Amino acid sequence: MIDLNTLVQETGAESGLTFNIDGILLESVNLEYDGNVAAMIGMILKMCLEMSEDVNNGDLKQVMIKNKEGIVVANKDEYDNCVALLSKDISKMGLLLRKMDTVFNN
């Protein structure tokens, strides 16, 4: 199992959460409204998974959301367990992507 506190600390992310593909929160670190965030990211992952299957691009592994105020990187494993890291520092994007790839062995 992933140590979410360590993952947040090692990446410098402001917050993180673990949840299942149905958006049910398992754990969160430094995140207000964590249940709502888990539900929304879970829905995004599920929709992207279905789109990936529809266009025959293989299994979905990762979704990145970048906006003016920050970044969200969410990964899903083969058992539909999910981890998301959130940062307001866009310059950490490469570190977040690389660390999540390492954790999930993508």
Residue ranges and their predicted role:
Residues 1-15, 19-21, 25-106:
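Non-catalytic interaction/Regulatory regions outside core domains
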